[in-house]
């Protein structure tokens, strides 16, 4: 068994120790040993007593198993989104109640794009101004937590150019937590509907979150089933 105190820490005894130097040494060890992300994190916890700085990995999709989980949640709308709020998976209930993600190019499947650039999504919000402020604040937190601040900057710059409202909210530097709450929508067919929503981390995929929407009114579930039966099916991605 390799003990990190014995083999790694003496490297620093004859020179000033900085966080960057420690991070660099342990990163080099992890690369030399070809450690997985989980093994790399364990190495840092053993040697430094803390997790390493987050390394962001862009997600392009989900496994078939995760997609089956989403499908089994129907008629509850559910999506999986990245730390940069790109929607990478969804079920048919989400298609009929939220957005027809399958009809959009992958680049356009972003919650902030919907919120600030799609008039239909804006009109569907019960209180667009409050929802928009929450979305921007929660997005800022998620991107920073995932170590994706640099990756999202071009997207943020683009959205600032396209939406003065987004630009103003971004300048406010507000931060929000994404947990559990009530979402109210104006659906074009069902009218006003309310959902309890919860956000869940996807185990082993720190870059992904699953959002599940539970209808507050029980009769809405059967109405969602009816919409699903009447709507053509799209590919998941």
Regions picked out by a protein language model, each given a short descriptive name:
Residues 2-20, 30:
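Recognition helix of helix-turn-helix/homeodomain-like DNA-binding domains
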Residues 59, 64-237:
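Hydrophobic protein-protein interaction segments
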Residues 16, 33-37, 102-105, 146:
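Residues at alpha-helix boundaries and short interhelical turns
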Residues 8, 42, 185-189:
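Small/flexible residues
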Residues 16, 30-33, 85, 180:
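Short, flexible active-site loop motifs that bind/organize anionic cofactors or intermediates
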Residues 21-61:
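Short amphipathic recognition helices of helix-turn-helix/homeodomain-type DNA-binding modules
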Residues 2-3, 26, 47-49, 76, ...:
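Functionally constrained cores in energy, signaling, and assembly domains
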């Amino acid at each position: 068994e390799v003990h990190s105190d014995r083999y790694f820490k003496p490297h620093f005894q004859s020179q000033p120790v900085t966080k960057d130097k420690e991070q660099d040494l342990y990163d080099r060890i992890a690369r030399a040993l070809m450690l997985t992300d989980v093994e790399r994190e364990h190495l840092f916890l053993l040697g430094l007593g803390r997790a390493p700085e987050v390394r962001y990995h862009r997600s392009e999709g989900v496994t078939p198993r995760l997609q089956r989980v989403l499908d089994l949640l129907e008629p509850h709308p559910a999506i999986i989104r990245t730390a940069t709020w790109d929607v990478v998976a969804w079920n048919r209930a989400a298609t009929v109640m939220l957005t027809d993600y399958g009809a959009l190019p992958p680049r356009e499947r972003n919650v902030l794009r919907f919120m600030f650039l799609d008039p239909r999504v804006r009109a569907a919000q019960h209180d667009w101004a409050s929802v928009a402020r929450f979305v921007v604040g929660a997005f800022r937190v998620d991107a920073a937590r995932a170590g994706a601040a640099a990756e999202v900057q071009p997207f943020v710059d683009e959205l600032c150019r396209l939406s003065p409202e987004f630009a103003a909210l971004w300048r406010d530097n507000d931060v929000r937590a994404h947990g559990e709450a009530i979402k109210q929508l104006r659906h074009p067919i069902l009218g006003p509907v309310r959902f309890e929503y919860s956000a869940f981390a996807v185990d082993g995929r720190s870059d992904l979150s699953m959002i599940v929407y539970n209808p507050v009114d029980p009769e809405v579930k059967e109405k969602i089933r009816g919409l699903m039966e009447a709507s053509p099916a799209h590919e998941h991605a």
